[in-house]
Amino acid sequence: MRRNVILIVAVLTGPALSPASPAAAAGIRTHVQMCVEALTQQLAPEKIPGISDLFADQEARRAFYHGCMFPDWGFAVQGMKDAAEDAHWDKFQTRYLEILKDRFPLPWNGEAKREIAFYLGAVAHGAQDIPWHFDGPSHPSYLRLSEKYDKLNHGETEKRVDALVYIRYHREPGSDPLGKPDCAWPFGTLLAVYGPSHPEVTKEKLQQGCQALAAGYLGTGALGELHRKELPKKHPWNAAHLADYYYGGIEAGASMTSMLVSRYFARLRGGVHLQRDIAYQKPGEFIPFEGVADAHVYAAQETYNTGLEPLFELTGDGPGDERYGVIRFDLSALPARIPVGSARLWLYLAGRRGNPQTAPKVIAAYPLTQAWKEGTGETDGVAGFRGVPSTGGGISYKDGVGSIPGDPVDAVTIELDAPVGRWISWDVTPIVRRHIAHPEESFGILLRETRESAGGGGVLQFLSSQALKAQTDGYGGGARLGRRPALVVMPPGPQGSRYGAAEPTCPTLSCGPPARPGSAPPAAPPPARTGRAGSSRG
């Protein structure tokens, strides 16, 4: 055993896998751990019908982790670098999705679940790479900070972080999610996806790439085992922050994975999952979906705007403290007059402030009846909620947008002892259907307490579409990104319904509290990653 470990490390650190080599793939073990944490800590399966059933299948889960490795396959195979690069981006992913939809209609059997899970892992890998490799507006990439603080280049960072991942997460017996990776890839489907644009890709080349990734995965584990005491001391920034750096760390990658897996799974079922992305690199590597606007207003500061605050407040703190929220999703991608099975708005309840909650809070959802502008009001990118005087037409209480237009489409009661740190949802199907029939009359959703509820104390705070950092220093983790407001629209019929009579419980998924049934229409996806301009991967 010792001899085998030494041989693996010799291969890992020899010329074939030197830091400058394309075979020093983008942190394969790190990618897998991001996918593990997405399933166990970030993904909210109650939001997407059918997704819990998919990942309750252990073989599908293993296929998902293998898919998280897949896109880097060609960096270790001569002449396959372009094919590997393309596997990271939307053109490849969209063709892949269409082939899966054609080959595997519902209901999905075991083979279909494994193929779909593998695909979702591949999508996750590409998303994880963006903040790892590339700076965003005011967001330094993970690789940039690794170079700054630990003096490690691209390839060195990825090998050593993989070894640190092994030390922290995979060293204990039974904790490695893959153990020994295999090459049971869906080669036939992959060849069909590659066929039109990459005829040079063969099953033999894919197998060669798979074997190289498996060797790298095992090799970084061996490196971590042999140097488990020295590596954390030698690379202190990476050892301290590989998980909690908000832009590119493991938690951030898991959060991004949960968003993309939800988005593409909804597309596979003929629906749409809308959630605001970070404006990563734009234009170029990534065209983010930014079509979500939200703000809350309150009577105590009737000219204030909160459009860029990370916290979204929907209830007052007792008599006279009137406040309400508005939210709008860009539904322009929805085909005209498409049948809608269900549509649900999901908000993440982050906390309470002010006086103790003295009675149940009832928050109702209504269609908005007039136009409004999100605005740029911001006081604190971590804990802000107060806003600043409105400029440039940003919505404020004085605008009077919150007039109640009749009966609500849905209302949610939040009890005194209801826990925070969970998703809350409203059935907004009538509002989405109205938008499809009369888009010129669609202005979004109004969320406010009912008159009977408004007298009680306690302000309920949800995460807004601007929520990102949990600490000012950037080391509070990246979970907030995947907990921004979401609209899930699913079609009628089997695609938009749950498997069987009830959604199965997945014991190792963080399914959270049970949600009321819901979903909504089939729709074109939001703008996605396109092209590969300026790519520097591998």
What are these regions (language model features)?
Residues 14-22:
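C-terminal segment of classical bacterial N-terminal signal peptides
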